[in-house]
């Protein structure tokens, strides 16, 4: 059986919190920002938790995260 490996892209994009939830950065804040309102850009700051329906995919990509 081959080695289990962590997906490098997931390793860079997700962080596991002590409680077992996973945080991620928000999308739509990289470019084409002139047409977005200041309020919209402000709400895209920071991180949010990954939704429960996606946690199975995250657990497969991060096998050693203990999810």
From Swiss-Prot:
Molecular function as annotated in GO: structural constituent of ribosome
InterPro entries assigned to the protein according to its UniProt record, in alphabetical order: Ribosomal_bL35, Ribosomal_bL35-like, Ribosomal_bL35_CS, Ribosomal_bL35_sf
Pfam families (UniProt xref): Ribosomal_L35p
The encoding gene: rpmI
A biological process from GO: translation
Keywords from the named record: Ribonucleoprotein, Ribosomal protein
GO (cellular component) term, any one: cytosolic large ribosomal subunit
Superkingdom: Bacteria
Cross-referenced PANTHER family: 54S RIBOSOMAL PROTEIN BL35M (PTHR33343), LARGE RIBOSOMAL SUBUNIT PROTEIN BL35M (PTHR33343:SF1)
Protein's UniProt name: Large ribosomal subunit protein bL35
């Amino acid at each position: 059986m081959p080695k289990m490996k962590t997906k490098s892209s997931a390793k860079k994009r997700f962080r596991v919190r002590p409680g077992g939830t996973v945080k991620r950065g928000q999308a739509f804040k990289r470019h084409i920002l002139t047409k977005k309102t200041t309020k919209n850009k402000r709400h895209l700051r920071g991180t949010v938790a990954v939704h429960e329906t996606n946690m199975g995919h995250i657990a497969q990509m991060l096998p050693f995260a203990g999810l």
